[in-house]
Amino acid sequence: MTDTEHRLEVVEAKEAVRDCLARYLDLCDVPGPLQSPDQLGVLFTDDATWEGLGPEYAGKFGIARGRDEIVALVSRYLPPADHFLRNVHLLGSEQIRLDGNRASGQWIMQQLSLYATGTAEILCARLTIDFDLGRTGGRTAARMSRFCTRRMFAAPLPAEAMFQRI
């Protein structure tokens, strides 16, 4: 493999990781494009884990093992469940490392939420995620094999601000 081919492989692998995580967060936004829980499931390996870490998230989320448990856990917070009225995710501070057909990454996620209860908050969490890399249709594809989230910051927001129109 030439240096150029290797560099292209690295770029494609990192882009596949970004695409997978961005799709997951897009599906978790409310309102969002989620039509079926299966859309979430295909983003994870069969034996994936999804885990809440730290004092705020370990008890709230615990650990889900396997694709079906992960989809069930995440679906509890998405329509048609009456949890969020609005919810949006933003990512930053990206770090992606590649090791053969595996990748790992860390991000800071900002989440703005308006709950069905009428309360609103902003929070930041550290996401630490492992991915399996493969080829699908001639392209590099990533699926999450381990997803960990740890809350770093949270503060209430005035709910009326979430209803403002631009």
Predicted features, each with a name:
Residues 25-33, 49-55, 113, 136:
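Short regulatory "switch" loops immediately downstream of catalytic or recognition motifs
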Residues 34-109:
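A solvent-exposed, acidic/Ser-Thr-rich amphipathic alpha-helical stretch
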Residues 1-30, 34-43:
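Short, low-complexity N-terminal intrinsically disordered segments enriched in polar/charged residues
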Residues 9-16, 62, 84, 119:
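Conserved aromatic-histidine-acidic binding/catalytic patches
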Residues 3-7, 23, 53-57, 79, ...:
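A near-ubiquitous, low-amplitude feature marking generic local secondary-structure context
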Residues 2-5, 83-166:
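A beta-strand edge to alpha-helix "cap/lid" segment located at domain peripheries
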